[in-house]
Amino acid sequence: MTRRIICQKLGKEADALNYSPYPGELGERIYNHISEQAWQAWLSHQTMLINEYRLSLIDPKARQFLEQEMINFLFGTGSEKPAGYTSEKE
């Protein structure tokens, strides 16, 4: 049976994640309050950030930037798109 939660990002009941996707307390917070659908939306947004800003994941500053953007996206007011960004769908 799939675990259901009230997703903090979506503001509605949704399927929960099957495992903690991130280490530490933040990972537990994500596991307990963020749905699979919201997590997938974050992964897509994260990919866009990595590509648009040409981030190297071996750079500690890039990882710190992505972690802060993840917190903003999942729990805050949202993560901003890079200036001038337009998706292929638009």
From Swiss-Prot:
Q: Which Gene3D superfamilies match?
A: Fe(II) trafficking protein YggX
Q: Example GO molecular function term?
A: iron ion binding
Q: Which InterPro entries match?
A: Fe_traffick_prot_YggX (IPR007457), Fe_traffick_prot_YggX_sf (IPR036766)
Which cellular component, as a GO term, is one annotated location?
cytosol
Q: Name one Pfam family in it.
A: Iron_traffic
Q: List the disulfide bonds.
A: none
Mind listing the GO biological process terms from this record? cellular response to oxidative stress
Q: Which domain of life does the UniProt lineage start with?
A: Bacteria
Give the record's keywords alphabetically.
Iron
Q: Family assignment?
A: Belongs to the Fe(2+)-trafficking protein family.
Explain the purpose of this protein. Could be a mediator in iron transactions between iron acquisition and iron-requiring processes, such as synthesis and/or repair of Fe-S clusters in biosynthetic enzymes.
- Record-linked NCBIfam families: PRK05408.1
This one is known as Probable Fe(2+)-trafficking protein
Organism the protein comes from: Coxiella burnetii (strain RSA 493 / Nine Mile phase I)
